[in-house]
Amino acid sequence: DDGWFGDKYRRVQDNSSLGDWVVDRKKLPNGLENLIQTADRNGIKFGIWIEPEAVNSKSELFEKHPDWALQVKGRPLQYGRGGTQMLLDVCNPEVQDFMFGIVDNLLGKHPQIAYIKWDANVELKNYGSTYLPQDKQSHIYIEYHRGLNKVLERIRAKYPDVLIQACGGGGGRASYGVLPYFDEFWVSDNTDALQRIYMQWGTSYFYPSNAMAQHISASPNHQTGRIIPIKFRCDVAMSGRLGMELQPSKMTKEEYQQTAQAIKDYKSVRDVIQLGNL
């Protein structure tokens, strides 16, 4: 998850290190390989969190390439999450190569990685590009997504079998424009099962269930504080692509039993839920 990376600037808070996609050896002295091997020994496929489109002003990447961040000439930079986060200028082919390299380096060194959570936690705040000519500055949204699609096309051409989730502050990446490249999108950061019923029902009017990531989460819920029985949480999450957002060390015996049964039941009907015709 978020926090595995950073060298000169370690990712100990959310205000640094985005762009510096190297393993934090103080946190992980044996690197990612040890984690991957541990997961494999326990019969679990390994997944990793990245946010390739973003950069922190407190990062080695920004120190080396300040022109790689979206920016308006003559205006101060506007920051998002952590007071330091910005979007990279994906219009720029050099930035596109860098972003592809993030994924290519990870999967090249660690071919056992089966899942990527591609996050996006800052909106476009600086409406300018140092790469685009003056007459294209008004096309920043269009050129940004054209550049992003070029990166994603390269990733999918080389790594067609890796499962990639489009996450973005909740449903920020729920879009048919990204579904050719992503296997699923995160419906919402709000995982309260009662509220999720309404969200998932509404989303299902526009998107198929096999594109909707729906996870069993903790109780009390982290977003609403609501206490919800584990059976109800499982049942609601089973209406799309079932996943887990639970810390095993904090799970009760009942939660272990119910989630194990839910996963077993889900596998028996997964083809119908994800691919069935109504």
Protein language model annotation of sequence segments:
Residues 34-46, 106-112, 151-162, 240:
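A structural motif corresponding to the C-terminal end of an alpha-helix
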